[in-house]
Amino acid sequence: MISDAIRAVILGIIEGVTEFLPVSSTGHLLLAERFFDLGSGNFWDTFTVLIQPGAILAIVVIYFAKLWRVALGMFSNPADRRFVIGVLAAFLPAVIVGLIAGKYIKELLFNPWVVCFSLIVGGAVLMWVDQLDHRPREHDATAFPLPMYVWIGIAQCVAMIPGVSRSGATIVSAMLLGADKRAAAEFSFFLAIPTMTGAFAYDFYKNHADMTTDDLGTVAIGFVVSFVTAIIVVKAFLSYVTRNGFTFFAWWRVIVGTLGLIALALGR
C-alpha cells in the first residue's frame, strides 16, 4: 500500500513534468490514478487541481522580471496594457465555457478511454503542425495582435477535454496563427497563470470545507514537488523546442495513448 505522502510526491512529479509540456497533465494524472493505484475518490480528484499552484508559481519565478515590468507598466505603457488585455481576452472563453459546461464535461468525458483517444489524436495534430513550413510573423509573446489572443483563448477551451492538453492546444493555435515556437510556448505559460489560478480557486472554494489537516499536508507536499519539477522542466522545454520542435512530444502522446488503449482493452 502506497502512503499518501508517496502518492503526493509521484503525482506532484507528474504534474510538474507534464503541465507545461503539450502532453496533457490531466490525462497523465487520470491514467496514473487508473493504472497504478495512485489515488481515487473525491480528495484525489481535487488534489490534482490543488497542486497546480506549484506549477503556476514556477512560471512566476522564471518570468518574474518580465511579469513585474508588465505589472508596473500596464497603466502607463500602452504595450504592457495591451498585453494584459490580451491575456484577459484569451482567458475569458475558458471562464465562459467552464461555467456553462464544466460540470457536464467532467461527468461525461473524464474517463481513460477519452484520455487515450485524445492523446493519440492530439499527437497526430502536433506532429502535423510541427512539420508545416512555418514562416512565423510573431516573435514576442507579449506583442501578439489582439484577435490572435482571442483565437488562442478559444482554442484553449478544447483542452477541457481530458487528454487534449491546455498547453498543446494553445501552442498549436499560436503557431498556426503565426507565432514562432518559443513565443507560442511562452504565451501558453503566461495564459496558464490566470487559467490555472481560476481552476484552483474554484475547486478549493467547493471542497475546502471537506478537507482535513492531513489532507492539507498532503497537498503541500504535492505543491512543493510540482513547483520544483516545473521549474526544471520549463527551462529545459524552451531550450529543446527552440532547436528540435515538438515531434518528440507528439510521439510521446501517441505511445502513451496507444499503451493505455491496449491496457483498457485487456481489462485493466
From Swiss-Prot:
TM region positions: 47-67, 83-103, 109-129, 144-164, 184-204, 218-238, 246-266
GO aspect biological process, one term: cell wall organization
Catalyzed chemical reaction(s): di-trans,octa-cis-undecaprenyl diphosphate + H2O = di-trans,octa-cis-undecaprenyl phosphate + phosphate + H(+)
Coiled coil: none
Membrane topology: Multi-pass membrane protein
Top-level taxon in the UniProt lineage: Bacteria
Keywords: Antibiotic resistance, Cell inner membrane, Cell membrane, Cell shape, Cell wall biogenesis/degradation, Hydrolase, Membrane, Peptidoglycan synthesis, Transmembrane, Transmembrane helix
Location(s) in or outside the cell: Cell inner membrane
Record-listed E.C. numbers: 3.6.1.27
InterPro entries reported for this sequence: UppP
Predominant location category: membrane
Any GO MF annotation of the entry: undecaprenyl-diphosphatase activity
Pfam families in alphabetical order: BacA
Glycosyltransferase recorded as keyword: no
Broad EC category: hydrolase
One of the record's GO cellular component terms: plasma membrane
Cited NCBIfam families: PRK00281.1-2, PRK00281.1-4, undec_PP_bacA
Function of the molecule: Catalyzes the dephosphorylation of undecaprenyl diphosphate (UPP). Confers resistance to bacitracin.
Miscellaneous comment in the UniProt entry for this protein: Bacitracin is thought to be involved in the inhibition of peptidoglycan synthesis by sequestering undecaprenyl diphosphate, thereby reducing the pool of lipid carrier available.
Similarity comment: Belongs to the UppP family.
Protein name, UniProt field: Undecaprenyl-diphosphatase
Encoding gene per record: uppP
